[in-house]
Design a protein with these regions (language model features):
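Exposed, low-structure sequence patches enriched in small/polar residues
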Residues: 1-161
Length: 161
Protein backbone atom coordinates (compact mmCIF):
# COMPACT_ATOMS: atom_id res chain seq x y z
CA UNK A 1 0.00 0.00 0.00
CA UNK A 2 1.14 3.51 -0.74
CA UNK A 3 -0.19 6.85 0.49
CA UNK A 4 1.00 10.39 -0.24
CA UNK A 5 -0.40 13.44 1.50
CA UNK A 6 0.45 17.10 1.27
CA UNK A 7 -0.80 19.77 3.61
CA UNK A 8 -0.54 23.53 3.56
CA UNK A 9 -1.66 26.07 6.13
CA UNK A 10 0.83 28.85 5.40
CA UNK A 11 -1.74 31.17 3.78
CA UNK A 12 -4.71 31.00 6.13
CA UNK A 13 -7.68 32.48 4.20
CA UNK A 14 -5.26 34.02 1.74
CA UNK A 15 -3.10 37.12 2.07
CA UNK A 16 -3.79 39.71 4.77
CA UNK A 17 -6.55 42.01 3.53
CA UNK A 18 -7.41 45.38 5.07
CA UNK A 19 -11.11 46.17 4.67
CA UNK A 20 -11.85 49.85 4.64
CA UNK A 21 -11.41 52.98 2.58
CA UNK A 22 -9.57 56.31 2.74
CA UNK A 23 -6.91 54.81 5.01
CA UNK A 24 -9.40 53.80 7.72
CA UNK A 25 -9.32 50.07 8.32
CA UNK A 26 -12.42 48.81 10.05
CA UNK A 27 -11.35 45.18 9.89
CA UNK A 28 -8.36 43.07 9.02
CA UNK A 29 -9.27 39.79 7.31
CA UNK A 30 -7.26 36.58 6.89
CA UNK A 31 -4.54 35.47 9.31
CA UNK A 32 -7.04 33.02 10.80
CA UNK A 33 -4.53 31.66 13.34
CA UNK A 34 -5.61 28.01 13.05
CA UNK A 35 -6.12 26.12 16.34
CA UNK A 36 -5.83 29.34 18.41
CA UNK A 37 -8.58 31.64 19.69
CA UNK A 38 -8.48 34.94 21.52
CA UNK A 39 -11.16 33.96 24.09
CA UNK A 40 -10.89 30.23 24.79
CA UNK A 41 -7.77 28.11 25.02
CA UNK A 42 -6.18 26.47 22.00
CA UNK A 43 -7.69 23.42 20.26
CA UNK A 44 -5.68 20.95 22.33
CA UNK A 45 -5.98 18.15 24.86
CA UNK A 46 -3.34 17.91 27.58
CA UNK A 47 -1.07 20.11 25.46
CA UNK A 48 -1.22 17.98 22.32
CA UNK A 49 -2.80 19.03 19.01
CA UNK A 50 -6.23 17.59 18.27
CA UNK A 51 -6.71 16.63 14.63
CA UNK A 52 -3.32 17.30 13.07
CA UNK A 53 -0.04 16.22 14.68
CA UNK A 54 2.01 18.61 12.53
CA UNK A 55 0.70 21.65 14.40
CA UNK A 56 3.16 22.07 17.27
CA UNK A 57 1.00 21.75 20.40
CA UNK A 58 1.20 23.88 23.57
CA UNK A 59 3.13 21.12 25.37
CA UNK A 60 6.20 22.30 23.41
CA UNK A 61 5.93 25.93 24.59
CA UNK A 62 8.78 26.76 26.96
CA UNK A 63 6.86 29.73 28.41
CA UNK A 64 3.85 27.59 29.42
CA UNK A 65 1.32 29.43 27.24
CA UNK A 66 -1.71 27.41 26.10
CA UNK A 67 -1.48 28.31 22.41
CA UNK A 68 -0.07 26.97 19.17
CA UNK A 69 3.22 28.71 18.43
CA UNK A 70 3.42 27.11 14.98
CA UNK A 71 0.37 26.79 12.74
CA UNK A 72 1.70 27.93 9.36
CA UNK A 73 3.04 24.76 7.76
CA UNK A 74 3.69 23.18 4.37
CA UNK A 75 4.27 19.43 4.65
CA UNK A 76 4.59 16.24 2.62
CA UNK A 77 4.00 12.73 3.97
CA UNK A 78 4.69 9.35 2.37
CA UNK A 79 3.58 6.02 3.81
CA UNK A 80 4.48 2.61 2.40
CA UNK A 81 3.44 -0.75 3.82
CA UNK A 82 3.47 -4.28 2.56
CA UNK A 83 3.67 -8.00 3.25
CA UNK A 84 6.49 -9.55 1.21
CA UNK A 85 5.64 -13.01 2.57
CA UNK A 86 3.08 -14.82 4.72
CA UNK A 87 4.99 -14.14 7.91
CA UNK A 88 6.55 -10.72 7.29
CA UNK A 89 5.14 -7.19 7.13
CA UNK A 90 6.73 -3.75 7.01
CA UNK A 91 5.74 -0.11 7.31
CA UNK A 92 7.72 3.01 6.37
CA UNK A 93 6.51 6.54 7.19
CA UNK A 94 8.33 9.70 6.03
CA UNK A 95 7.26 13.29 6.75
CA UNK A 96 8.96 16.57 5.80
CA UNK A 97 7.65 19.96 6.90
CA UNK A 98 8.56 23.63 6.58
CA UNK A 99 7.27 25.79 9.44
CA UNK A 100 6.75 29.55 9.70
CA UNK A 101 5.32 30.02 13.24
CA UNK A 102 2.14 32.14 13.42
CA UNK A 103 1.12 35.42 11.79
CA UNK A 104 1.49 37.30 15.09
CA UNK A 105 4.76 35.57 16.08
CA UNK A 106 6.56 34.37 12.94
CA UNK A 107 9.83 32.46 13.19
CA UNK A 108 12.92 34.46 12.21
CA UNK A 109 13.86 31.70 9.75
CA UNK A 110 11.81 28.88 8.25
CA UNK A 111 12.15 25.82 10.49
CA UNK A 112 12.46 22.48 8.72
CA UNK A 113 11.66 19.08 10.21
CA UNK A 114 12.03 15.52 8.89
CA UNK A 115 10.44 12.56 10.70
CA UNK A 116 10.60 8.88 9.84
CA UNK A 117 9.53 5.48 11.13
CA UNK A 118 10.48 1.99 9.96
CA UNK A 119 8.70 -1.04 11.41
CA UNK A 120 9.13 -4.74 10.60
CA UNK A 121 6.78 -7.44 11.95
CA UNK A 122 7.30 -11.21 12.00
CA UNK A 123 4.21 -13.40 12.60
CA UNK A 124 5.25 -17.07 12.45
CA UNK A 125 2.49 -19.30 11.11
CA UNK A 126 3.53 -22.19 13.37
CA UNK A 127 3.03 -19.99 16.50
CA UNK A 128 -0.62 -19.08 16.00
CA UNK A 129 -1.43 -15.58 17.31
CA UNK A 130 2.13 -14.55 18.15
CA UNK A 131 3.92 -11.67 16.44
CA UNK A 132 7.17 -9.85 17.00
CA UNK A 133 7.85 -6.29 15.85
CA UNK A 134 10.85 -4.02 15.88
CA UNK A 135 10.71 -0.37 14.92
CA UNK A 136 12.95 2.65 14.84
CA UNK A 137 12.06 6.31 14.45
CA UNK A 138 13.96 9.56 14.16
CA UNK A 139 13.36 13.28 13.92
CA UNK A 140 15.86 15.65 12.38
CA UNK A 141 15.46 19.40 12.11
CA UNK A 142 15.39 22.73 13.89
CA UNK A 143 11.70 22.72 14.90
CA UNK A 144 11.57 19.82 17.38
CA UNK A 145 15.26 18.97 17.36
CA UNK A 146 17.03 15.71 16.69
CA UNK A 147 15.50 12.68 18.40
CA UNK A 148 15.70 8.93 17.91
CA UNK A 149 13.84 6.02 19.43
CA UNK A 150 13.08 2.37 19.04
CA UNK A 151 10.51 -0.16 20.14
CA UNK A 152 10.35 -3.93 20.48
CA UNK A 153 6.89 -5.55 20.67
CA UNK A 154 5.93 -9.12 21.52
CA UNK A 155 2.22 -9.64 20.95
CA UNK A 156 -0.16 -12.55 21.49
CA UNK A 157 -3.77 -12.50 20.33
CA UNK A 158 -6.27 -15.16 21.27
CA UNK A 159 -5.85 -17.74 24.02
CA UNK A 160 -2.43 -18.83 25.24
CA UNK A 161 -2.16 -22.60 24.83
Amino acid sequence: ALVYECMGSKNQTGPIFYEGFRGEFEQVSAKDNYYNHYIYQAWQHWGMAMGNPLFTGPVYNKDGRIMFANNRINAHHLGISGTPGKEWAYRLLLTYSRNWGTYDNPFDDVKKQFSSLLEVTYSPVKWNGWSFSISGAMDRGNLLGNNSGGMLVIRKTGLIK
